[in-house]
């Protein structure tokens, strides 16, 4: 139901008729309100209808007025709501203002508790050479005036005069007449006039002190001057009271007023003025200034120190020393000569309340500054050498270190490195210019080249390394660069640069020695300087190769010399050889039932045939055999002529014979293949030693008869050569064993020797092939043919494989 009721009401209110009705009602109400407002403003009373009787007029009037006032009540109600809201806002605003005021008061109280931060002019402590009496002494708080009655300025003046401390006798103010005021005014004028005279010593124009006094008189504020003028006027009126009879108003003064202190200040100024005028001479010059050089330093300024008598304080190690800026000539003269120009800024630092106080302080400061500066000037004149040494000391070095630096080593700081860099640059540049001038002389080209090399290296060192070092010094001094550069870094870098500087110095010394020797030894120093070192490992290897090549060349030259003397050696050998050797130069093979004799082919002939087959160049036996014989005959000539021991002579002969064969073999190999020369020559000695050892071991084991040594040697050689050529030989001699029974014993012995020699030849051939370089068997096809030939020479037997015969 609620939903339907509200819905019907909404539809009713939203109808067109209801909207028109509401508009008409509102319009009528507004018209009534306007009419009543105009009526109340113009007439202030209700309208009276004449038709209404008197009795009902009041009621009607009341009713009408009640009806008329009903919209007024509604408007008053609405107006009252607005007023209430505005009143509430006003109350909130007032409350906010009160809270804000309370907050300000609380903050002020808290600030007062914490203390107010005061801002003012900072007055630093006075330096030692200035006056410290009046600046250092603080004004004592004035005590309250102990008087119960009425306090006047005259009474406070009398009290301050009684309690004043000092030896000055100031006449008390008397109440005579107005002449004292007239006397005081001329004194003030005289004081202002006399002030220029105090500082015009030696100057005809107005001094800077007079200008300072005028400037200060202008800067004094009016609030500072008023109490002084008022005090003087009241003093005058007070003094004039007995004569004039007019009562002067005496304002009550507080005990802590500044007026008595100002009066006392004026009196102090009078006393100081009288003392200054008494001290001045007839020309306005101070008497003390004339006797300044003879005066001793004031002892009152000396401060007591707890340090020992000769103790010198030094700053810590890491503390940066104070750097004094250099003085210009004008500032140096102003500092050393006694004048008062430096006092121009004094009024800004120490300002006083009155002109009299400022003038008095300036006078006393001028006197003491003149005294101090004159003393400093005298001390500087007496110790000129000490001051010069101090001013010439290196920048950044403390005074204590500067005085002791003559005996100790100077510290390695930035000025030290700059100084040493400049000195080295100047020295090396002078050397370069000196030696460049000597290039025009008539000297050798090698000496000129050496001079140009040394000078160029020196200039490159100055341009590159010295400039780099200078940049590092700048970085250290001005704190530049990505990383901080310290003096230790500079020291290490200079150590590296000094090695190059020493090298250049050594080269200049070599040039000086070369010049002293008359430019004669110019080749040796240049080679020593310009030659580069060779790596020791490569040197040893190359040396070994060179030694091997030299040994191979020497052996080849010996073989060639032996071949040149071949014809003469052949003739001598044929003439000296006995006929018996021709019979023995046969190999005899006895099989028991038959006997075979064949001519002997020498070992050198066999080897030469093999070499000819190997390289494809056929060699005739007539050409090869004499070469082997020539080498063998050359070695035989070196043997002693006397008959040696059989064993030793046989072993030596076999050794030489085999070595001759090996030498001829090496010669044949070296001639067509020069690439294999080095390796074969290097291993030649090793092969020879192995052959000697094998031959010696075999020969010692052979049972030999005590026959002729030469015959046995030849038989052994023929047996070896015959065994190697038994297969290829075709000259066979067969004999009946029955007819040769007388030689059974000899044949058995020869057979044993032949077997031993065959074994010796096998071992010799195999060992020689094993000792040959492996590269030959891999690279050259001739070596394969060579290895096949000895194998063929070894394949022979002593049985029926060679020749088959039927038994008898």
Curated annotation (Swiss-Prot):
Primary location: nucleus
Species whose genome carries this gene: Mus musculus (Mouse)
Post-translational modification as stated in the protein's UniProt record: Ubiquitinated, leading to its degradation.
Region (Disordered): 134-282, 377-413, 629-654, 735-757
Lineage: superkingdom: Eukaryota
Function field: Potential cell cycle regulator that may play a role in carcinogenesis of cancer cells. Mitotic phosphoprotein regulated by the ubiquitin-proteasome pathway. Key regulator of adherens junction integrity and differentiation that may be involved in CDH1-mediated adhesion and signaling in epithelial cells.
Residue numbers of Phosphothreonine PTMs: 337, 386, 617, 728
Pfam families: GKAP
Location of the protein in the cell: Nucleus; Cytoplasm; Cytoplasm, Cytoskeleton, Spindle
Residue positions, PTM Phosphoserine: 66, 70, 201, 328, 598, 607, 612, 620, 743, 797, 806
Biased composition (Basic and acidic residues): 135-145, 180-193, 232-241, 249-278, 642-654
Gene (UniProt): Dlgap5
Tissue expression from the record: Expressed at low levels in normal resting liver. Up-regulated in regenerating liver after partial hepatectomy.
Record's subunit section: Interacts with CDC2. Interacts with the C-terminal proline-rich region of FBXO7. Recruited by FBXO7 to a SCF (SKP1-CUL1-F-box) protein complex in a CDC2/Cyclin B-phosphorylation dependent manner. Interacts with CDH1.
Comp. bias (Polar residues): 382-392
Keyword presence, Cell cycle: yes
Protein name: Disks large-associated protein 5
Family membership: Belongs to the SAPAP family.
